[in-house]
Amino acid sequence: MAVLSCKGNQKSSLSIILTIFVLGFRRAAINTSSPMKILIDNGHGIQTKGKRSPDGKLLEYAYTRELARQIVKILKSRGYDSELLVPKDDDIPLSERVRRTNAHCQALGKSNVILISLHLNAAGDGTKWMNATGWSCYTCKGQTESDRLADCLYKAAEQILKNQVIRTDYARDGDADWEENFYILRHSLCPAVLTENFFMDSLRDRDFLMSQIGKKGIVDTHIKGILNYISFFFAIPH
């Protein structure tokens, strides 16, 4: 039987106390009496010019809405409070998307809401095929809670999209996500990220996106990343 010294017990006790304090602090930042609201945004709309593959077979507004609906459906089936930020096909202005997001933040508390905006990437103007490829996730500039959400999504992508290119930007601030002051990220009060789910003007990515394996991989990546983020605070198994 191992015997700990008094000094060892003191260190162990201190470690336990610090752990409890940190977990308590994290959870205090979230109103646990109110469920986490998971908002899923889908890029652009039916009226948005361009935003398609060069052959016209892949439309960003339609594709992101298809996957967003699947993500919300799966989350709801597992008992989570999730909804589409833009349920219709119309291209809702960014200011209105932010207004809807922040209305939830004001009602529930900004720490009880997260926003994930789904998009497809493009390297050119949509008239010809390009060579860029891969999945990536964006946050606004600076260190915020959005970085933790992005980290959870990146870890999920690395596990699920194993044979695909995962685009990272560790050089800027030491974490994987890319940083841009996109309007919806900069003005949303809650943790918010924007995922660029491969390139619609890459033949390689276009074929993957349109495959059932590709669609499932992207949906599963978002589900796993979101649930990993929520479980970090609430210790909810998934």
Show which residues each predicted segment covers.
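Active-site-adjacent substrate-binding region
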Residues: 146-174
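Mature extracellular/periplasmic domains of secretome proteins
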Residues: 97-111, 182-187
